[in-house]
């Protein structure tokens, strides 16, 4: 009697009660094809699926699990917090401690407000910027994903990149009114001339510029120094708010986030993922002058029943304590670079056009000769080669992001033995391409 594939059985079952069988589109394997892996448990750098098959995890919950799955210290902190209650709907000392820790690690953040998701963080930051400036227009960049708030679903990256309308201001999702996104201007990433032109024409109407300081939703794309400098100069000159969406990069690429590596001081910063240690937790913060416009002090309303959830706060505090230890990011960055060098060498050994890039514990690889620097360039990479490579690596027990438009992540638990296993799997996979 043939053994039942539990992943397939669970996927079939899930589709009866969950749209598409998943609670976030990229998990459905639509771009790569095949059956999604349903996770049963995870530890360190590994997870086991419903068939009890072990995989090396190279997405780490899309970034949050920087100290490894089920880290004993984080688990203990969560258990202790859960013993008192899962939620109060009232202030706690833990919220203050987490806010103090964030403000200490990110000097641009003078005050911070907790929320429950990255989408809430960016949505609230935009509302705050509009309330502070009294303006409506916002600028975002092609391929940057800032959550699924309506006004930001225009030319986004991630799973939507595969079917987004190419029209300048067309919504990337059904259900988003064209009338709403008319307030969103979309510009090419890394294009200095484009942003200079828009500010020259409409500078006094722009409330905010929101940017992924290292784009991670069109694979990994780094900004040029000139591009970032132009954005900071123009927003300051015209009184627009510069919002750094560090939901992905905050505490992932460096202890002070991407802004600490780039020497840029944003007006507002959005955080998530790592700051919650894998729990539903996010935040937005920045200049006290701007943050004071939030209710109950000001007239910009924002609220949430589960904001500052005590269990999530406990996970976040312990995670930030661990990543703050001496040598953490040097080790994480070194391991990521070692992995990238190994993947590149394996591709070169098999004459496969392939490039890599990384920052801290975040990486990207591309089936093309040069590292892309824009949304347009990413769309021209070899997607068919990626799909084949994804499944070959999956067969070797290595779980990559099931999309060519997503960055990858490692954790401090990815030691040399794990890296060697990944590189050996890549060598075998490249030979079969």
Curated annotation (Swiss-Prot):
GO terms for cellular component: cytoplasm. It catalyses: (S)-4-amino-5-oxopentanoate = 5-aminolevulinate. Its cofactor is pyridoxal 5'-phosphate. GO terms for biological process: protoporphyrinogen IX biosynthetic process. PROSITE patterns: AA_TRANSFER_CLASS_3 (PS00600). Pathway: Porphyrin-containing compound metabolism; protoporphyrin-IX biosynthesis; 5-aminolevulinate from L-glutamyl-tRNA(Glu): step 2/2. The keyword Isomerase applies. Gene3D superfamilies: Aspartate Aminotransferase, domain 1 (3.90.1150.10), Type I PLP-dependent aspartate aminotransferase-like (Major domain) (3.40.640.10). It is an enzyme of class 5 (isomerase). It is found in: Cytoplasm. Keywords: Cytoplasm, Isomerase, Porphyrin biosynthesis, Pyridoxal phosphate. GO terms for molecular function: glutamate-1-semialdehyde 2,1-aminomutase activity; pyridoxal phosphate binding; transaminase activity. Its EC number is 5.4.3.8. It holds the Pfam family Aminotran_3. Coiled coil: none annotated. The modification N6-(pyridoxal phosphate)lysine is found at residue 273. It comes from the Bacteria. Homodimer. NCBIfam families: hemL, PRK00062.1. Belongs to the class-III pyridoxal-phosphate-dependent aminotransferase family. HemL subfamily. This is Glutamate-1-semialdehyde 2,1-aminomutase. It comes from Polynucleobacter necessarius subsp. necessarius (strain STIR1).
